[in-house]
């Protein structure tokens, strides 16, 4: 069974809004708009060398970020998470400082975004899209992933929403959707959850059988509550990388039950489907 390792360490809420630290002095609106923006990421509490940065930015002594000059570039280090902004060498720098225990294999750091304490990254493969989210808050959150297909760059064809309830602290999850059009956009919204997440050890799920037409899942609920299990599954290549054809499904399990569920693949899924991720919450 393939699934993301869940790290249960509680963390403080991420300051997604970030803070602006920059050079003293004023600049015109026109001049600001002309500056090139550089987007990079760094890990909380660890040194990041910014190679193309030659000048040490001037920052307030009250900030939790530091810079030092080396022969290879400027060393950056932050003791705060979230988005850090500063200006230097005629450029706008935006550094997304991510938690040290983010499951790094599931995220492309250069594409990372953050909203209300949830980090997420999106990928596409032809008409397949998937968004992996990670909750760095110290409370359960509901994450809504909206996928919009466009007939062209500006004409909306349809939008579909998928809500993942009670994503636990330190938990990551992968949404999948099959696009109807070549042009599509993804967005994520986050709210504090009214649901209660279920610990990983209380739930078991695995791929039972699979073929071109359908996939069956074996699921066990060891809790005294009725729960909903969210399953993300996809084709993986020989290196374990997501290749194509992903789906996300809801499975409701009665208390203390063992169930087998069969889900149609609509004929386009290959026959080496594996579970990429799953998590569960108490059903209201």
Predicted segments with their positions:
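Low-complexity, acidic Ser/Thr/Pro/Gly-rich terminal tails and inter-domain linkers that flank the onset
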Residues: 101-126, 190-213
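Asparagine-centered strand-capping/turn motif at beta-strand->loop junctions
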Residues: 132-139, 219-223
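Terminal connector regions
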Residues: 171-215, 266-284
């Amino acid at each position: 069974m393939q699934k993301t390792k869940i790290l249960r360490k509680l963390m403080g809420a991420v300051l997604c809004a970030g803070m602006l630290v920059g050079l003293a002095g004023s600049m015109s609106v026109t001049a600001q708009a002309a500056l090139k923006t550089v987007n990079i990421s760094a890990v909380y509490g660890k040194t990041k060398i910014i190679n193309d940065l030659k000048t040490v930015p001037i920052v307030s002594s009250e900030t939790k970020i530091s810079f030092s000059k080396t022969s290879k570039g400027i060393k950056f280090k932050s003791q705060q998470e979230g988005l850090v902004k500063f200006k230097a060498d005629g450029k706008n720098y935006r550094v997304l400082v991510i938690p040290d225990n983010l499951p790094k294999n599931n995220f492309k750091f250069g594409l990372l975004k953050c909203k209300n304490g949830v980090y997420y990254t999106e990928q596409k493969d032809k008409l397949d899209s998937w968004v992996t989210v990670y909750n760095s808050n110290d409370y359960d959150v509901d994450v809504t992933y909206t996928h919009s297909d466009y007939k062209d760059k500006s004409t909306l064809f349809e939008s579909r929403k998928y809500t993942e309830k009670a994503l636990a602290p330190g938990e990551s999850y992968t949404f999948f959707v099959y696009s109807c059009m070549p042009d599509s956009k993804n967005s994520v919204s986050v709210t504090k959850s009214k649901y209660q997440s279920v610990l990983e050890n209380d739930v078991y799920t695995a791929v039972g059988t699979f073929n071109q037409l359908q996939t069956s899942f074996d699921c066990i609920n060891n809790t005294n509550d009725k729960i909903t299990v969210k399953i993300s599954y996809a084709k993986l290549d020989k290196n374990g990388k997501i290749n194509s054809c992903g789906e996300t499904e809801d499975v409701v399990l009665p208390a203390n039950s063992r169930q087998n569920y069969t889900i149609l693949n609509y004929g386009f899924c290959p026959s080496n489907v594996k579970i990429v991720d799953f998590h569960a919450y108490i059903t209201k």
